[in-house]
UniProtKB/Swiss-Prot annotation:
The record's note on its domains: The PPIase activity resides only in the second parvulin domain. The N-terminal region and the C-terminal tail are necessary and sufficient for the chaperone activity of SurA. The PPIase activity is dispensable for SurA to function as a chaperone. The N-terminal region and the C-terminal tail are also required for porin recognition.
Transmembrane segments: none
InterPro entries in alphabetical order: OMP_Chaperone_SurA, PPIase_dom_sf, PPIase_PpiC, PPIase_SurA, SurA_N, Trigger_fact/SurA_dom_sf
PANTHER family: CHAPERONE SURA
Localisation: Periplasm
EC number: 5.2.1.8
Presence of keyword DNA damage: no
Function: Chaperone involved in the correct folding and assembly of outer membrane proteins. Recognizes specific patterns of aromatic residues and the orientation of their side chains, which are found more frequently in integral outer membrane proteins. May act in both early periplasmic and late outer membrane-associated steps of protein maturation.
Assigned keywords, A-Z: Chaperone, Isomerase, Periplasm, Repeat, Rotamase, Signal
Span of domain PpiC: 163-264, 273-372
Name of the molecule in the record: Chaperone SurA
Main location: periplasm
Amino acid sequence: MGAALLCSFAHAEVVPLDRVVAIVDNDVIMQSQLDQRLREVHQTLLKRGAPLPPEHVLTQQVLERLIIENIQQQIGDRSGIRISDEELNQAMGTIAQRNGMSLEQFQTALTRDGLSYADAREQVRREMVISRVRQRRVAERIQVSEQEVKNFLASDMGKIQLSEEYRLANILIPVPEAASSDVIQAAARQAQELYQQLKQGADFGQLAISRSAGDNALEGGEIGWRKAAQLPQPFDSMIGSLAVGDVTEPVRTPGGFIILKLEEKRGGSKMVRDEVHVRHILLKPSEIRSEAETEKLAQKLYERIQSGEDFGELAKSFSEDPGSALNGGDLNWIDPEALVPEFRQVMNDTPQGELSKPFRSQFGWHILQVLGRRATDSSEKFREQQAVSVLRNRKYDEELQAWLRQIRDEAYVEIKQ
């Protein structure tokens, strides 16, 4: 979203005459909206060098996308989803950073391109509303069973996707095809000389830049993250025994002699993680309780807890998190990385035994209390969490498309000719 925002509005212009092109439930889509989106799509396709479909086909596709977005926007409005100015300002700041600018520079860039910063904010606000609608209507309903996780972990696909990954760099000393034995021996001596320099502490990246014939030499030999199964023999069997920072002895390959360095590894191995025991109260804005009223209620509950009332009892009475309310808001021991950023940040900043002030996340208003912290070997748990994440993402894509078809079928849509 952020990287494309500048070009998204890049050709906005005043349309002297406007008309309704579609009625969508209680709202309408105007010709000017359709024309602007068509210009954006044209610009995107041209930048990619992609062929443009026939104009009538493209117009139909873009109008259908606008209809689906409009339906989701109306669902958000009816559900009381509101984006505060603070959240919107934070989102705009993030977009500016992704474009390598300060917020002021970003505003100037928009103005220079003839764009309205207010229009840009409104587009981002709509996208945030739609994201939260999808979170509530689709993501929160997805369930992954323990049996599904077990089946995935036992499958070949699961083993491949969750196996250990290695960040590698290499140095290649080339050997031409049909090389003589003298040439091969000279290359072997050169590779062995470099290996000895590395064992004595020479910088791998510098040697790669100056001596490697690989196409990644100027990047210090970096080849990125790889799984063992993605490596050619014999590296696939060698890599597991290396410690981070180790280099292999020169290995003869069809292209020459290769020295491999293990820069970093992740997944698969023993993993010690910090866990936090936390409980919270969640209050969600809705059609019958506005954003301001929800924030006010959160503040009142915070004051009541500070005055000595029992956190757990108030959570049972007021919290709208179905997974924890009946347990007094207790989320038990949890990996901070499994939480949304806003919740994680406040939790990390709250001392053990202390209460946070009310704060907002994408789910609503929270009050949290940190009950304990510990470090634990969570290798197996982490693999299970990874499996859940893979399965949830897979289900989400399927469920989202089904839900979009459903709301489109249920909506009243009249397209004007």
